[in-house]
Amino acid sequence: MATHKKPDLSDPTLRAKLAKGMGHNYYGEPAWPNDLLYVFPIVIMGSFACIVALAVLDPAMTGEPANPFATPLEILPEWYLYPVFQILRSLPNKLLGVLAMASVPLGLILVPFIENVNKFQNPFRRPVATTVFLFGTLVTLWLGIGAALPLDKSLTLGLF
């Protein structure tokens, strides 16, 4: 059963408003030719113009050339792998580090089974899922920031 209100097109007032371009078009507008011929090309050209403008105004820096005979003191991964790198770097046993990384998805799989409430509720009324999300976000940020620091300062973030 539909709950959408259908417009009464026999109403002369509504027809006059629609003829003037006023009011909402509840009954829809066909995609051909309006969107495909007019809207989509403008969006595509605008996106292309933004990309070209960004490439011209802010070209990518190439950096210094690589020297195969000089190894850096500490090799760091890309920024999005910092938390995983910090787990592997701070735990003494490699197997323990791999198990710690594997336990993260397993813990996330268990969250819906721990919290037995309606899944369509407000997220702030689901305390377990909200707490797990906030704790996981804080731990990920802590690990990511700590990975960029030297090993002796990484766990305390250099604060203590």
From Swiss-Prot:
It is a multi-pass membrane protein. This is Cytochrome b6-f complex subunit 4. One of its GO terms (molecular function) is electron transporter, transferring electrons within cytochrome b6/f complex of photosystem II activity. GO terms for cellular component: plasma membrane-derived thylakoid membrane. Component of the cytochrome b6-f complex, which mediates electron transfer between photosystem II (PSII) and photosystem I (PSI), cyclic electron flow around PSI, and state transitions. PROSITE patterns: CYTB_CTER. The 4 large subunits of the cytochrome b6-f complex are cytochrome b6, subunit IV (17 kDa polypeptide, PetD), cytochrome f and the Rieske protein, while the 4 small subunits are PetG, PetL, PetM and PetN. The complex functions as a dimer. The keyword Repressor does not apply. Keywords: Electron transport, Membrane, Photosynthesis, Thylakoid, Transmembrane, Transmembrane helix, Transport. The chain crosses the membrane at residues 36-56, 95-115, 131-151. InterPro entries: Cyt_b/b6_C (IPR005798), Cyt_b/b6_C_sf (IPR036150), Cyt_b6/f_cplx_suIV (IPR005870), Cytochrome_b_C_euk/bac (IPR048260). Belongs to the cytochrome b family. PetD subfamily. It is found in: Cellular thylakoid membrane. One of its GO terms (biological process) is photosynthetic electron transport chain.
